[in-house]
């Protein structure tokens, strides 16, 4: 089974991915983790690296290609990433969304940075990604019609969101 888990920065993708991997034994492939590693290797912030990626399509294309290759190597895989639901053939595509204010608080806690900085950097990153994905893929990130399940994660913690997804996966397995 292949599941994609996409969503906005700070929407809870990584936390939910861990819950799903634990319950179903999914191998998790994370685009965000790859992107953060590449940024760190170059000594850049995510905002700086995002601006670089805006002018260098090889960065996104390499991450996408790697995800596609890895997703074919395992029988049960969860592919986590902003574009995963649009670029990976999957049994279920999930999108997590949350208001920016809440996501900034989560990112602030995760990265140990002030909330205002997390807000500004996340907002800048999203503007950059909207432009980048439209330019490279002709994708409108605000169009969620390709997803089977869209969840507002401001209403539940990671376990609550995961329990909703567990039910959807269990029903899919019955079909």
From Swiss-Prot:
Q: What class of enzyme is it?
A: transferase
Q: Which GO terms describe its biological process?
A: pyrimidine nucleotide metabolic process
Looking up InterPro entries in the UniProt record yields: Cyt_kin_arch (IPR011892), Cytidylate_kinase_dom (IPR011994), P-loop_NTPase (IPR027417)
Q: In the Enzyme Commission scheme, what number(s) does this protein have?
A: 2.7.4.25
GO molecular function list: ATP binding; CMP kinase activity; dCMP kinase activity
* Record's GO cellular component terms: cytoplasm
This enzyme catalyses: CMP + ATP = CDP + ADP; dCMP + ATP = dCDP + ADP
Gene3D superfamilies recorded: P-loop containing nucleotide triphosphate hydrolases (3.40.50.300)
The alphabetical list of record keywords is: ATP-binding, Cytoplasm, Kinase, Nucleotide-binding, Transferase
Statement: the UniProt record of this protein carries the keyword Transferase? yes
Q: Which compartment or compartments is the protein found in?
A: Cytoplasm
Tell me the residue numbers annotated for binding ATP: 7-15
Q: Which family does it belong to?
A: Belongs to the cytidylate kinase family. Type 2 subfamily.
State the name under which the record lists this protein.
Cytidylate kinase
